[in-house]
């Protein structure tokens, strides 16, 4: 850490412009007002596509970085408003149309529902019996479990929260308008990274975690303790009573003096043992609820709060003390990295695409990590035995993660095309990566080929041996074994090493690594996962699909500005169909096209992950516990024997498990049957755009226009075929939508039918 003399670094002034942009409803009412050519109105049908493509492309509205920054900042508030309205709607459904109170009284036998379909012409068939005399649509968002963990005990509290969400949405809409039209920050404010880090670390993350820890200690833990003890929700004191009446807390946790200030005295006097009743270090899962101990969670959030509040005081702002990000980056050099990170400060403070690329890649990776943790270390009471919710949350976080990572590559390529400055990046890490991009991409290509042929070869070998009646020559746990020895070693390490690495913790992080079965109400919430040859094989398919996705996306970023084929690619922009007539073989080389192709491989990668997860959990984890202690898994442990060849995946996973969705007609699951059928249609519809030539459609359109002219009903706006890129965009959107909805219907119909 260094200090800076005052004269070298002037005080940062937080400055705003007053009334920079007038509020004009008249202007906003004109479609395309942000672009001079679009504002003239439509001449051809291409206008509507360009309107959508450019509405949020602020770079095309203005080249002024300050104005672009303000638009992004304002849009963030608009986005938050949408999120609050969306959340408010879900809480309102919980308040008005749900069986939350009934579920709270019996979370083992009653299923969550927060939507009741109105009878118009027979749709009421969708209202299934979820237990407790309630009929409605089964929900799988995990919100009921989250609400219980937070200490919500009745529908009125949900209604109040829903109203609060609308108030917050209104505030965000106001803030978005105010900070663009009335008091708009100057560019220096957006580029003041040290202040931003301090506020985000100490404020959002630090105080946010502290507030949540406070809520858990004062509201959630006491209410959950009473619920776990069997106290009816109606007899539990209201949340504010635990805060305003110290006697209630004293009754539950007598070792702390629950006064206005006396409660925090042990914290500052380091007498932390007083808090041991509600800030625990138990580890593992609560056997009653199958979830992480709420008292462990409160402990975690308090510790995180302290860390982030400290972290929020590390960076140098007005007081000349602390770290400078620019200095840290410029000092960050290794023996083989030339100028190291020099220039990256300028990159990340002048290109929001570069900043966004990193953020999307990080948050996408984090979402995938969340998916892996949420089932193994279920955070909310009774959610571990709600298998439909578990599969939904895993699938959701995997898709979101994959989409965000592709978005990271998209904005990385946009940065390279629009914002990259060779003068700033001289022999730094970015420049050096770009200069040896051929070595990177060719090696990555070799890895993809190796993984592809070997991983697929395992399955082809097994299909062949099975067809020849030679099971002893198959790769399997009973034939030629390919045991995942490193994964098994990590599992045993996590189980056994806990005694020496964390002596105060009562159990390892999750029974999934080893230990006892956690069963709630006769259903397995979590138990040790045995890995074998089938997992080893599908793992290498995961490795292949991930590496191919990375190959496509990284190639798109590294060759976005230039390539041997098109040295001046940067001049053509982020998206272009081909490099003009007379340049054969230059189609589908733009940065945009790499994102387009990357999306398909991302879809492949995530699909195989969620299929693997779904089948593995049904085969080896989820099921019922018999009175004698034996476990009946949903698919009876068939993963190890069936997932080792392609025929097994087709027959015992896709075909066998689609029984529920295919046979759903005439039941409350019939909507999933229609979605399954309809989503297949949407997926097939996408192929019409993907296996297509623009000229074919233009010729067809001209014939149709000729017929309209003959009949004197020709439109004023000239019809035009979609451009090549528009066609690809429509194609990939429907491909992903169709594929994802098909999978959604397939999973949910099965898990809802299984109960």
Curated annotation (Swiss-Prot):
Highest taxon above the source species: Bacteria
Bilayer topology: Multi-pass membrane protein
Enzymatic reactions: reduced [plastocyanin] + hnu + oxidized [2Fe-2S]-[ferredoxin] = oxidized [plastocyanin] + reduced [2Fe-2S]-[ferredoxin]
Transmembrane segments: 72-95, 158-181, 197-221, 297-315, 352-375, 391-417, 439-461, 536-554, 594-615, 669-691, 729-749
Keyword Glycoprotein: no
Binding site for phylloquinone: 697
Function: PsaA and PsaB bind P700, the primary electron donor of photosystem I (PSI), as well as the electron acceptors A0, A1 and FX. PSI is a plastocyanin/cytochrome c6-ferredoxin oxidoreductase, converting photonic excitation into a charge separation, which transfers an electron from the donor P700 chlorophyll pair to the spectroscopically characterized acceptors A0, A1, FX, FA and FB in turn. Oxidized P700 is reduced on the lumenal side of the thylakoid membrane by plastocyanin or cytochrome c6.
Family: Belongs to the PsaA/PsaB family.
Subunit text: The PsaA/B heterodimer binds the P700 chlorophyll special pair and subsequent electron acceptors. PSI consists of a core antenna complex that captures photons, and an electron transfer chain that converts photonic excitation into a charge separation. The cyanobacterial PSI reaction center is composed of one copy each of PsaA,B,C,D,E,F,I,J,K,L,M and X, and forms trimeric complexes.
Protein name: Photosystem I P700 chlorophyll a apoprotein A1
Organism of derivation: Synechococcus sp. (strain JA-3-3Ab) (Cyanobacteria bacterium Yellowstone A-Prime)
């Amino acid at each position: 850490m260094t200090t800076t003399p005052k004269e070298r670094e002037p005080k940062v002034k937080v400055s705003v412009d007053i009334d920079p942009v007038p509020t004009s409803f008249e202007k906003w009412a004109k479609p395309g007002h942000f672009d001079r050519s679009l504002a003239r109105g439509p001449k051809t049908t291409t206008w509507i596509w360009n309107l959508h493509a450019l509405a949020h492309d602020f770079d095309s509205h203005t080249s002024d970085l300050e104005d672009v920054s303000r638009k992004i900042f304002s849009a963030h508030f608009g986005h938050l408003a949408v999120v609050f309205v969306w959340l408010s709607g879900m809480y309102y459904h919980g308040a008005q149309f749900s069986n939350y109170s009934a579920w709270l009284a019996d979370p083992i036998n009653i299923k969550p529902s927060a939507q009741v379909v109105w009878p118009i012409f027979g749709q009421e068939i969708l209202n299934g019996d979820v237990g407790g005399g309630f009929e409605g649509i089964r929900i799988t968002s995990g919100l009921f479990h989250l609400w219980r963990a937070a200490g919500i005990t009745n529908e009125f509290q949900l209604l109040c929260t829903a109203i609060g969400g609308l108030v917050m949405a209104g505030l965000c809409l106001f803030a978005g308008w105010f900070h663009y039209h009335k008091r708009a920050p100057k560019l220096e404010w957006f580029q003041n990274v040290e202040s931003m880090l301090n506020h985000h670390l100490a404020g959002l993350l630090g105080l946010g975690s502290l507030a949540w820890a406070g809520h858990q200690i004062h509201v959630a833990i006491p209410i959950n303790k009473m619920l776990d003890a069997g106290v009816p929700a109606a007899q539990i004191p209201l949340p504010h009573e635990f805060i305003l009446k110290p006697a209630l807390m004293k009754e539950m946790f007598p070792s702390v003096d629950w006064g206005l200030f006396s409660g925090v005295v042990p914290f500052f006097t380091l007498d932390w043992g007083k808090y041991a009743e509600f800030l625990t270090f138990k580890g593992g899962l609560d056997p009653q609820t199958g979830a992480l101990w709420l008292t462990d969670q409160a402990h975690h959030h308090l510790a995180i709060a302290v860390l982030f509040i400290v972290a929020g005081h590390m960076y140098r702002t007005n007081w000349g003390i602390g770290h400078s990000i620019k200095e840290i980056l410029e000092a960050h050099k290794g023996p083989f990295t030339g100028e190291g990170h020099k220039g990256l400060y300028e990159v990340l403070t002048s290109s929001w695409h570069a900043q966004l690329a990193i953020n999307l890649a990080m948050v996408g990776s984090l979402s995938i990590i969340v998916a892996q943790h949420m089932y193994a270390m279920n955070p909310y009471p009774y959610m571990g035995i709600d298998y439909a919710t578990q599969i939904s949350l895993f699938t959701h976080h995997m898709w979101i993660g994959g989409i965000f990572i592709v978005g990271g590559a998209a904005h990385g390529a946009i940065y390279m095309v629009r914002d990259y400055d060779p003068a700033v990046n001289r022999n730094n890490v970015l420049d050096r990566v770009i200069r040896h991009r051929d070595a990177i991409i060719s090696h990555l290509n070799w890895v993809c080929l190796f993984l592809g042929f070997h991983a697929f070869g395992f399955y082809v070998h097994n299909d062949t041996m099975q067809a020849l009646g030679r099971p002893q020559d198959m790769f399997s746990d009973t034939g030629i074994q390919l045991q995942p020895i490193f994964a098994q070693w990590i599992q045993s390490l996590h189980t056994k090493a806990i005694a020496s690495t964390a002596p105060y913790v009562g159990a390892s992080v999750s029974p999934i690594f080893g230990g006892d079965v956690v069963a709630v109400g006769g259903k397995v919430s979590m138990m040790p996962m045995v890995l074998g040859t089938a997992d080893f094989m599908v793992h290498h398919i995961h490795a292949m699909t991930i590496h191919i996705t990375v190959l496509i996306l990284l190639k798109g970023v590294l060759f976005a500005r230039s390539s041997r084929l098109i040295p001046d690619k940067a001049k053509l922009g982020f998206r272009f169909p081909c490099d003009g007539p007379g340049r054969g073989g230059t189609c589908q080389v733009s940065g945009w096209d790499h994102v387009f192709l990357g999306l398909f491989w991302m879809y492949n990668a995530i699909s195989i992950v969620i299929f693997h997860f779904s089948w593995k959990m049904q085969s080896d984890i989820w099921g019922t516990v018999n009175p004698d202690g034996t476990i009946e898994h949903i698919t009876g442990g068939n993963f190890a024997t069936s997932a080792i060849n392609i025929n097994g995946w087709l027959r015992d996973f896709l075909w066998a498990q689609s029984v529920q969705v295919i046979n759903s007609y005439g039941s409350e699951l019939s909507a999933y049957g229609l979605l399954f059928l309809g989503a297949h249609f949407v997926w097939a519809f996408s192929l019409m755009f993907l296996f297509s030539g623009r000229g074919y459609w233009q010729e067809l359109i001209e014939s149709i226009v000729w017929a309209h002219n003959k009949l004197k009903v020709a439109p004023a706006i000239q019809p035009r075929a979609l451009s090549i890129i528009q066609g690809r965009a429509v194609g990939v959107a429907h491909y992903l939508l169709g594929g994802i909805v098909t999978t959604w219907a397939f999973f949910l119909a099965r898990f809802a039918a299984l109960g």
